[in-house]
């Protein structure tokens, strides 16, 4: 029974261990975008769990087997996220500019400005 972000339920005593996402990327994307996507996904799942009344503890591991005995004992549930993601430029909101090779210090590479959109799947277990 999911409650939207604006609606909060009564706090529970249970703590959920939220493991770091382990995503596979099918594109050669910049690390900054990979990290931003992981962080935003983690924040969104954390919000959903908090709105359900759980206390969320972020864990720096992405494998449940790496949890210590104390962590397993403390947590009511461990939540892992994995999946396969493709980040692509949104064709409606992205502009590709040709670089000017005559400029001093120019790399000769095209420049893109716009929005990346994710596609793929995320499995939460």
Curated annotation (Swiss-Prot):
Superkingdom: Bacteria
GO cellular component: cell outer membrane
Keywords of this entry: Cell outer membrane, Lipoprotein, Membrane
Compartments it resides in: Cell outer membrane
Keyword Phosphoprotein: no
Provenance organism: Helicobacter pylori (Campylobacter pylori)
Name of the molecule in the record: Neuraminyllactose-binding hemagglutinin
Membrane topology note: Lipid-anchor
InterPro entries: NeuraminylLac-bd_hemagglutn, NeuraminylLac-bd_hemagglutn_sf
Chief localization: membrane
Region (N-acetyl-neuraminyl-alpha(2,3)-lactose binding motif): 92-97
């Amino acid at each position: 029974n999911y409650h939207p972000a604006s609606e909060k339920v009564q706090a529970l005593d249970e703590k959920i261990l939220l493991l770091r996402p382990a995503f596979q990327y099918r594109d050669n994307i910049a690390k900054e975008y990979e990290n931003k996507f992981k962080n935003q996904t983690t924040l969104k799942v954390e919000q959903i769990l908090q709105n359900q009344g759980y206390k969320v503890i972020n864990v720096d591991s992405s494998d449940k087997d790496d949890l210590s005995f104390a962590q397993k004992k403390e947590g009511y549930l461990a939540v892992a996220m994995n999946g396969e993601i493709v980040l692509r430029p949104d064709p409606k909101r992205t502009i590709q500019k040709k670089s000017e090779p005559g400029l001093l210090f120019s790399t000769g590479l095209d420049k893109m400005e716009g929005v990346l959109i994710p596609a793929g799947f995320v499995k939460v277990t």
